[in-house]
Amino acid sequence: MFASKPAKAYVFFLANPQPQNASSQDMETYPELMMQQVQSLSLILTREANDLTQAQCDVMLNGESTGILVPGHILEAAVQVNDQRYILFLTDDVIFEESLTIALIDVHDGLKEIVRLGNEYSTGSFADLQITDDSVNFRFIGDYIWTVEVSDSPRLHLPFISDPKGLKRESGLKKYIAISATPSPENIS
């Protein structure tokens, strides 16, 4: 009367299978990629700037389109954070009102976050890029050294409290990019 259904088979895969009695010396380790400046990224202009909006560009990785669109016209620098994430430092080449756009992109997940550094009628010049294992330092506006750190997962962002003056980001309670500004050593008396 009743047809029997075939038994279901379940297969489980462990993300990181490890022998239960293996010591840390037996385990193979892989070094993490340290932040580094790269030349493998470039931009292709998709929309010119106008009075109301920044220029927009498609991000190219090794000459291939990523499909990721970012605001800005000039790629000042690109820093590889890990095997799929990059920090882009972008400007629009606007005299007397230059601002810096910092974009975090993920080649698999697209644009993760954008922050902007600058104010009306202020000029800045991107300079002195220095990269450590977990941060990027540079100069842009004023006599400050700006430091950018990126987290793997979003962190709590408290609007109006946690960012230095001149930094703008979209409203929300999460961030991947943390930015701080410290007076440059030659200006401390």
Which role fits each region the language model picked out?
Residues F96-A103, Y144-E149:
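Structural motif
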Residues P71-V81, E120-L129, L167-G172:
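Repeated scaffold domains used in trafficking and secretory/extracellular systems
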Residues E28-T46, Q130-S189:
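Acidic, small-residue rich beta-repeat scaffolds with periodic aromatic anchors
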Residues E64-L69, E113-R116:
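A short beta-strand motif characteristic of beta-propeller blades
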Residues A49-Q54, I95-E98:
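Short, solvent-exposed loop/turn segments at conserved positions within beta-propeller repeat blades
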Residues T53-G63:
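Short polybasic amphipathic segments
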